[in-house]
A protein has these predicted regions:
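GHKL/Histidine-kinase-like ATPase module
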Residues: 72, 87, 107-214
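GHKL-type ATPase core
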Residues: 2-112
Length: 214
């Protein structure tokens, strides 16, 4: 987690206070010259992580670090990589809603809208493949497929399996689409399955999970 933080941040500060403790501690580092831990102040229990985002480098092709301050970018990253973490990840999200109509509004009144912020849960928390097959309907399989892969058609086949061994256990949910991807016969096609560990996306296209002859 700290390594990923320093990919976009020039300085990381962690303020933590254990439940039942009167003392908080502050961990700080710039990612280059070690770190410091000192007593600090925190009114409530828990942990706050504060990132100082790097300034954008010059150049047209340079990375833009301030995009990680944008709501849609952060929420998209959470849904992509941490959608199945087993605790809620919440964020203040903007929503547009109509203002109350005035009592003396004219007949041709056009509604006015305002932006409000609500604390939304971004992740679904429970992956479908960890549930027992007997508790899942085909409609639920199909709905998950459509939402996950942005395909309006139902899959041609759904394969859901669970395996336990001495050294490893896994759940697998495979979908065979009704039609081949548009880029299937092009050089740009990337094969592979999505690989998750403890609910976190490790690889989006892991080619080694499924051999070509399958």
């Amino acid at each position: 987690g700290f390594y990923a933080s320093f990919m976009v941040a020039s300085h990381v500060k962690v303020v933590s206070k254990a439940c039942g403790s009167d003392q908080a501690y502050v961990w700080e580092s710039d990612g280059a010259d070690g770190f410091t831990i000192e007593p600090g102040e925190k009114e409530t229990y828990g942990t706050d992580i504060i990132l100082t985002i790097k300034p954008n480098p010059e150049g047209e092709d340079a990375e833009s670090y301030d995009e990680f301050l944008q709501t849609y970018r952060l929420s998209g990253l959470v849904r992509k990589y941490s959608d199945y973490i087993r605790y809620p990840i919440k964020m203040l999200m903007p929503h547009s809603q109509a203002k109350p109509k005035p009592e003396d509004a004219p007949e041709d009144y056009q509604p006015e809208y305002e932006t409000i912020y609500t604390e939304d849960t971004l992740n679904s928390m429970v992956p479908l493949w960890t549930k027992d097959k007997k508790d899942i309907t085909q409609d639920e399989y199909d709905e998950f497929y459509r939402n996950k892969f942005m395909d309006y058609m139902k899959p041609a086949r759904t394969i859901h399996s669970h395996s336990e061994g001495l050294t490893a256990s896994y759940d697998a949910l495979l979908y065979i689409p009704s039609q081949a991807p548009y880029d299937y016969y092009s050089k740009d096609f990337a094969k592979g399955l999505s690989l998750y560990t403890s609910g976190v996306l490790i690889m989006d296209k892991c080619a080694d999970l499924l051999p070509d002859y399958f």
